[in-house]
Amino acid sequence: PGVLADNLKSAGISLVNIATNHALDSDAAGLVSTIGYLDQAGLAHVGAAATADGSTDYTQNVGGVNIGFIGYTNSSNGYSLDSDAECVLNTLNDYDAQSIETLCNRVSAMKDETDLVAVMLNFGSVESDSIETDQQALAQKLCDAGADLILGTGSRVMKPVEKLSSEDE
């Protein structure tokens, strides 16, 4: 993993979302190890933190535009963190209503602090090339909460790009 983090950095990648369905494949220790490698390589990351008080979000000023990044995954393939785990993974727990509300509240709060909010979201069925109903509904909620850009991953195939309008537009 350390070599991969270094190679990503060398390739010009500066930010990664580690909230994916594979984030806990090697349990909490694997997640913490991954975060350590990313930190050593100088790669910013969203979606998880090595400690409960660590930040899972990231902001950066790019050309005078303050951009906030939030990372989440819809599921962790049935793996979960033990209640005593110190690390944090942002998950929606298979579109759980409370988890979605928490994410929308985070988007709204970040919108108050930044010029642009990008949500990096690992969701959708593998190899489905169409936007699913749950994805569409969540994307609209995020847009209404203030997300300017929603970057979806997880399906392993290209999906259509859509422009959404929020309720207040």
Across the structure, where does each feature detected by a protein language model lie?
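Acidic, metal/ion-coordinating pockets
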Residues: 1-169
